[in-house]
């Protein structure tokens, strides 16, 4: 009951009306001051930082250029199927005599199924025209088709298929380049964040140490404390100031190191704007979860380096089909339907076709096929080599992911211990401060406890930084830093 009465006596009395008005003014001014300081500081979040890199960084642009070049190569490969218009003119005159006068115009279309369609007109006259040519005007429509080698695939179709594959492969190469770039940028970003957080942490403790020094100076002037106590307090201020200056230097150098990732649209680098600060909140929200098995599964399906080799395998599969076709003899059919007076074709009944056509058949076959067999064997060896590389790379990636998982588990345990140490050192400091008020301790012990507490805070920050770096290295190893 006595405690309750004493507690009620400590209840603050209502402020006079004038004091209330002054207090409102102070609060309004304080809010304005805080809002101005907050607006002066610009928080650079990690996602925004990476977006800046993806837009203007030279490596990001180089990666996009590779994609654009592959797209241009694919577009050029389509050119083998462009219709081709040709014209040939040959004329010979001597002593006023026309020996021959040839004018041939032809339109030829290569199709993706291996069939070549053509149509043209010929005009031939002269005293010594070739017997193979039809005197006068001639129109024709014809087809050319391979029946063995080149029926399923030929060089032009293989190039087109491989160009489409290389275009997709360039996208994986871009992801791989950005994955490596993002890792370096993320590591430097969190280093900057940790340094800034250390600086913020130490400035708070520096303020506490200065307040303690001011109180001891007043107590010394009143004769309640000795000169040695003020000297102890001043030494503690100096100690924390040294730590703060070191953290400030690290924060500034870390901020400068981020400039190597910051480029504008004019390909000019720039430094962070004054007042830009990192996302300290995100640094404090360290996610403690084991994603090792999930990331291994993702890496096997989505890792850009493995994707590059898989597309190489697809391109080699096209090459294998082409080389297998080279083992077959060359056999081509040619057929033209003819008509005098250009395109004055009659109805396509049997007598007309039997009497107005031109037919050809080409056949060629090397007797030993050594070149074709050697090329085919080389392609099979390339496929075997690429399969071995994929298996080895997959195992390397899996081991990297697991090793970073082991590292994170160890850091997790250390973080838990560190959090407990912070609480314990804080309690020891509070107990020592209470004992000092009772005259049972010294300022030297207070400083010692405070130094240990600060040391535990900085150690905790260091462990958080190591954990974040390890977590993002694991994402990098899985190839999923870039979506």
Language model region names:
Residues 76, 81, 87-88, 108-111, ...:
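Membrane-embedded alpha-helical bundles of multi-pass transporters/translocases
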Residues 61-65, 78, 114-136, 147-173, ...:
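Sec/SRP-type N-terminal targeting helices
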Residues 86-145, 277-288, 320-321, 325, ...:
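Small/polar, glycine/serine/threonine/aspartate-rich low-complexity segments that form flexible
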Residues 40-98, 148, 152-158, 162-164, ...:
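Bacterial Sec-pathway N-terminal export signals of envelope proteins
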Residues 50, 62-77, 177, 181-202, ...:
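Amphipathic alpha-helical coiled-coil segments
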Residues 165, 171-295, 407, 452-453, ...:
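Periplasmic alpha-helical coiled-coil/stalk elements that build and connect Gram-negative outer-membrane
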Residues 1-3, 14-57, 61-64, 68, ...:
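Terminal intrinsically disordered/low-complexity segments used for targeting and assembly
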């Amino acid at each position: 009951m006595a405690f309750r009465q004493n507690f009620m006596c400590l209840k603050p009395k209502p402020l006079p009306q004038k004091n209330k008005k002054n207090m409102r003014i102070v609060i309004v001014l304080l809010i304005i001051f805080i809002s101005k300081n907050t607006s002066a500081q610009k928080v650079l979040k990690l996602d925004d930082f990476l977006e800046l890199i993806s837009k203007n960084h030279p490596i990001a642009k180089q990666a996009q250029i590779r994609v654009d070049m592959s797209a241009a190569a694919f577009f050029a490969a389509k050119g083998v199927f462009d219709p081709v218009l040709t014209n040939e003119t040959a004329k010979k005159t001597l002593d006023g005599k026309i020996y021959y006068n040839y004018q041939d115009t032809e339109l030829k279309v290569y199709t993706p199924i291996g069939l070549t369609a053509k149509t043209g007109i010929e005009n031939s006259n002269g005293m010594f025209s070739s017997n193979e040519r039809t005197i006068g005007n001639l129109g024709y429509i014809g087809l050319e088709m391979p029946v063995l080698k080149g029926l399923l695939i030929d060089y032009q179709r293989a190039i087109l298929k491989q160009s489409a594959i290389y275009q997709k492969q360039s996208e994986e190469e871009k992801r791989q380049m950005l994955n490596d770039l993002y890792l370096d940028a993320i590591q430097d970003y969190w280093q900057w964040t940790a340094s800034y957080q250390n600086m913020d942490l130490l400035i708070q403790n520096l303020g506490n140490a200065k307040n303690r020094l001011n109180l001891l100076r007043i107590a010394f002037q009143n004769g309640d404390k000795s000169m040695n106590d003020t000297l102890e307090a001043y030494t503690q201020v100096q100690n924390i100031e040294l730590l703060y200056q070191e953290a400030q230097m690290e924060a500034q150098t870390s901020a400068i190191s981020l400039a190597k990732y910051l480029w504008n649209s004019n390909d000019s680098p720039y430094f962070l704007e004054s007042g830009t600060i990192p996302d300290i909140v995100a640094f404090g929200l360290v996610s403690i979860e084991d994603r090792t098995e999930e990331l291994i599964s993702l890496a096997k399906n989505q890792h850009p380096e493995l994707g590059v080799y898989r597309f190489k395998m697809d391109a080699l599969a096209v090459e294998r089909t082409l080389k297998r076709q080279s083992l077959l003899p060359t056999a081509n059919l040619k057929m033209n339907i003819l008509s005098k007076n250009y395109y004055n074709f009659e109805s396509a009944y049997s007598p007309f076709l039997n009497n107005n056509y031109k037919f050809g058949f080409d056949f060629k076959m090397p007797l030993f096929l050594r070149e074709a067999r050697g090329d085919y064997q080389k392609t099979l060896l390339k496929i075997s080599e690429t399969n071995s590389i994929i298996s080895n790379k997959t195992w390397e990636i899996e081991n990297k992911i697991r090793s970073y998982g082991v590292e994170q588990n160890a850091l997790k345990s250390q973080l838990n211990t560190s959090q407990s140490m912070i609480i314990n050192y804080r309690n020891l400091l509070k107990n020592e401060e209470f004992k000092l008020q009772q005259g049972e301790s010294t300022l030297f012990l207070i400083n010692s406890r405070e130094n240990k507490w600060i040391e535990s805070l900085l150690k905790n920050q260091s462990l958080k930084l190591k954990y974040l770096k390890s977590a993002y290295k694991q994402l990098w190893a899985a190839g999923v830093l870039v979506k």
